[in-house]
C-alpha cells in the first residue's frame, strides 16, 4: 500500500513540475506581450501629443506598408486613440490571464501539500 501511495505522490509531483514549467513559460510570454503593448500604447500617445500641437486643418501622411495616405489630423487622432484603447484592453486581458495561471499553479501546489500531510498522518 505504501508503494502505491509513493507512486501516486511521484506522479503528482511530476505533473506539478510539468505544470509549473508550462505556466512559467506562459507567464513569461504574457509579460513580453504586455511590455510590447505598453510600448505601442506609449508610442501612440506620444505621436498623438505631437500631432495635437499642429493646426486643426493640417493634413498628414499616414504610412501604410510601402505607401503613404493623406489623412486629416482628426482621422489620425481618432486612429491613435483607438490604438491606445485596444492596447489597454489587451493589457488588462493579459494581466487577468497571468493572475489565473499563477493561481492555478498555487492551487496545484496546495493540493500536493495536502496529499503529503495526509500521507504523514497515516
Swiss-Prot record:
Q: Which residues cross the membrane?
A: none
Any idea which GO molecular function terms this record carries?
A: unfolded protein binding
- Alphabetically ordered keywords of this record: Acetylation, Chaperone
InterPro entries reported for this sequence: PFD_beta-like, Prefoldin
Q: Which Pfam families match?
A: Prefoldin_2
Which GO BP terms, alphabetically?
actin cytoskeleton organization; B cell activation; cerebellum development; protein folding; telencephalon development
What the entry lists under SUPFAM superfamilies is as follows: Prefoldin
* PTM-bearing positions, type N-acetylalanine: 2
What GO CC annotations are associated with the protein? centrosome; prefoldin complex
The record's subunit annotation is: Heterohexamer of two PFD-alpha type and four PFD-beta type subunits.
Q: Give the record's family classification.
A: Belongs to the prefoldin subunit beta family.
Biological function: Binds specifically to cytosolic chaperonin (c-CPN) and transfers target proteins to it. Binds to nascent polypeptide chain and promotes folding in an environment in which there are many competing pathways for nonnative proteins.
Give the protein's recorded name: Prefoldin subunit 1
